[in-house]
Design a protein with these regions (language model features):
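Basic nucleic-acid-binding interfaces
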Residues: 1-97
């Protein structure tokens, strides 16, 4: 299973995601695909977000102690950090503070 959450994304990306995944809430997409398909979908998200103002996060089932893995792209204050095999979230400082 995988979950993708997008914010400030181009409408064409949201339409493309809706083709592959179920949009259960505005900007929140879920589905159950193979690793290969998941990587293709995430590549589409990364290409669409690019250097724009949007951001996205993907979480998927993985054989880890936590049972999942995740990745981010775009302008996001939350960045994944590996800490002895555990995925944690580091918050970047707010610019100007």
């Amino acid at each position: 299973m995988m979950v993708i959450v997008v914010e400030g994304s181009p409408p064409r990306l949201r339409g493309r995601l809706a083709v592959w995944l179920l949009e259960i809430r505005a900007g929140v997409y879920v589905g159950d695909y193979s690793r290969r398909v998941r990587e293709v979908i995430w590549q589409q998200v990364e290409n669409a977000i690019g250097d724009g103002d949007g951001d996205a996060v993907i979480a998927w089932t993985a054989p880890t102690d936590q049972g999942f893995s995740f990745a981010t792209c775009g302008k996001n204050r939350r960045m994944p950090v590996d800490f002895d095999g555990l995925s944690l979230v580091r918050f970047a400082a707010i610019p100007g503070k």
